Amino acid sequence: MDMTSAFTLNVRLDHIAVVTIDVPGEKMNTLKAEFAAQVRAILKEIRENKEIRGVVFISAKADNFIAGADINMIDHCNTAMEAETLARQGQQLMAEIHALPVPVIAAIHGACLGGGLELALACHGRICTDDPKTILGLPEVQLGLLPGSGGTQRLPRLVGLSTALDMILTGKQLRPGQALKSGLVDEIVPQSILLQAAVERAKQERQTPRSLPVRERILAGPLGRSLLFRFVSKKTDQKTQGNYPATTRILDVIETGLSQGSSSGYDAEARAFGELAMTSQSQSLRNIFFASTEVKKDPGSTVQPGTLDSIGILGGGLMGGGIAFVTACKAGLPVRIKDINPQGINHALKYSWQLLDAKVRRRHIKAGEQARQLAKISGTTDYQGFAHRDVVIEAVFEDLSLKQQMVAEVEKNCGLHTIFASNTSSIPISDIAAHATRPEQVIGLHFFSPVEKMPLVEVIPHAATSEKTIATIVKLAKKQGKTPIVVQDKAGFYVNRILAPYINEAIRLLTEGEKVETIDTALVKFGFPVGPIQLLDEVGIDTGTKIIPVLEAAYGERFSAPANVVSSILNDDRKGRKNGRGFYLYGAKGRKSKKQVDPEIYKIIAVQGQSKLSAQQITERCVMLMLNEAARCYREGVIRHARDGDIGAVFGIGFPPFLGGPFRYMDSLGASEVVAVLQRLTSLYGSRFTPCEQLLQMAERGESFWKTSATDRH
């Protein structure tokens, strides 16, 4: 075979053929169309060599088997038929692997996803390592697609219908223990003996597939299948609000295969794959995927970052505890937490312990690993142990003088190279750095709550921040598992600035007589994960609204909230879920009682009308203000690219991913249409809807954001 091939064949002395997967020049193995000829040549050689007793597929990469198919292949398809042909080619290749006359074993270490798992499913057996890096799944639905190389047909027959539906409809990934329990893999072994174990299994006679559990056998029958599909379809529709056509097609394709046979199932799978590839939803989701990949590769600066050996954190509260967790347990860096109160340190340590303990209970990690990771976190009530910290992240109260004091203390007690990164959500970084002796090493690093779950961070340099500081903080954020966007130091930064008018308008709709649940339902139907009112309850009404006066002072009355409404709610001691009093009623332990609205809220906010707008009208008012503000941020250079604006909105506030983010969405509508809608809303509701100069200019010139943002503003 050609040494540049991604697939190479080696026939051992014991007559076991080992096919090694190693895509040249790439960190991850991904399947590309041009590899089909390489694999077919190997399969032909195996079929012709009558001495071969078995076959093992194994990866040469350090931490992945096959991470999936190359998504660019789909972008090169111009029609549904071309994408369907791509799927049929994949199906045929997998069928040829499955048809080999000797046992074929997939030896899996690391990520085995998408087309990688479909290849493993085509094998006669699967062994995986017990490593935490090993995950197995079919995430195509997250790109608005379905598995197109036989996954919708082989997986249900291997693991049962309910497990397969859960995996394919959600993109859920299984860890080794879960994969073994479900029957997805036959054996778990240490990485050191993976090849040896796979070879031994390949020498054995082909084993008959394991019998499915009784529950799965019942669900596989016509009656059980009918009931399950009806239940899952209803549940899926509630979750997707009809915005993701892939889920419906997945159900149809799997049902076709089970009721009409595999041949019909494969045919339906290929057709559905082709049609879904051409949908706007899949295109938008793929755009988000590509944009996210680009952001993760973007160093944030042309300058080399500094070293990152140890990190300090000021404040052991909710944010400090979360930042300590991602720094120690994801970035793998030693963390020292300073809090004036020992209870604060204990809180932060307990926070990480609880998160790790949940992983132990779910058997994602072992108790020894939990202890090893916790050992990276220490605490102090003074600056002992801070002298050599490379970065100190401040996560104290939103008080300017306190943060300035923290800067002075860090400059006094830490090294000359130490970077001060503030987790402020509202205070300008230039103000925090105003009295710094080394302002070039002061920067904003805005995490979102809960830190361990939210993927986005905003990196906020002020005018004097050095390029090296920017590069170092971007590097740290990536190590912490975050997707960083670099934004300008202006009031509200980017995410909170576009979120505020959206929240304000929802509150204004309440005062006009719209019901809480009507507003939230309308925006969830549009595609947000939760409505704006529920979002306020979740983040805390006090926390979620504290930015509004800051924005109003900076940008004027378009950011003003309805008079006295927020203060009236807060004066009634309503902070949302965290104190069990908000717009919604909360039961024991802060759990919502079927998301019922507290009727008292309408008396508190002094409703002044009986508005009865349609869901579309409600959505339009809230979303158009967000879009207009995003366009302003683009014009002012708050974000460097439309790409960063889309990633920030999708990852930071849950802007509907299937729309591609605010800038992709505006491009799909067209600037002229966005301007026309804003002008109509201005005539109906006032000047806060006045279209910004950026949109007016783009409408006049027929421009779009993505075509005009190819160059870096940096």
UniProtKB/Swiss-Prot annotation:
Domain of life from the UniProt record: Bacteria
Reaction equations catalysed: a (3S)-3-hydroxyacyl-CoA = a (2E)-enoyl-CoA + H2O; a 4-saturated-(3S)-3-hydroxyacyl-CoA = a (3E)-enoyl-CoA + H2O; a (3S)-3-hydroxyacyl-CoA + NAD(+) = a 3-oxoacyl-CoA + NADH + H(+); (3S)-3-hydroxybutanoyl-CoA = (3R)-3-hydroxybutanoyl-CoA
Chain segments annotated as coiled-coil in the UniProt record: none
Positions of the UniProt region annotated as 3-hydroxyacyl-CoA dehydrogenase: 306-714
Residue ranges of the TM segments: none
GO molecular function: 3-hydroxybutyryl-CoA epimerase activity; enoyl-CoA hydratase activity; long-chain-3-hydroxyacyl-CoA dehydrogenase activity; NAD+ binding
Keywords: Cytoplasm, Fatty acid metabolism, Isomerase, Lipid degradation, Lipid metabolism, Lyase, Multifunctional enzyme, NAD, Oxidoreductase
Disulfide bonds, paired cysteine numbers: none
GO CC annotation: cytoplasm
Site (Important for catalytic activity): 118, 140
Main location: cytoplasm
EC number(s) stated in the UniProt entry for this protein: 4.2.1.17, 5.1.2.3, 1.1.1.35
Gene Ontology biological process terms from the UniProt entry: fatty acid beta-oxidation
Oxidoreductase recorded as keyword: yes
SUPFAM superfamilies per the UniProt record, alphabetical: 6-phosphogluconate dehydrogenase C-terminal domain-like, ClpP/crotonase, NAD(P)-binding Rossmann-fold domains
Region (Enoyl-CoA hydratase): 1-190
Metabolic or biological pathway, per its Swiss-Prot or TrEMBL entry: Lipid metabolism; fatty acid beta-oxidation
Stored Pfam families: 3HCDH, 3HCDH_N, ECH_1
Quaternary structure and partners: Heterotetramer of two alpha chains (FadJ) and two beta chains (FadI).
Function: Catalyzes the formation of a hydroxyacyl-CoA by addition of water on enoyl-CoA. Also exhibits 3-hydroxyacyl-CoA epimerase and 3-hydroxyacyl-CoA dehydrogenase activities.
Family matches, as HAMAP family: FadJ
Homology family: In the N-terminal section; belongs to the enoyl-CoA hydratase/isomerase family.
Protein name: Fatty acid oxidation complex subunit alpha
Originating organism: Escherichia fergusonii (strain ATCC 35469 / DSM 13698 / CCUG 18766 / IAM 14443 / JCM 21226 / LMG 7866 / NBRC 102419 / NCTC 12128 / CDC 0568-73)
Lineage summary: Bacteria, Pseudomonadati, Pseudomonadota, Gammaproteobacteria, Enterobacterales
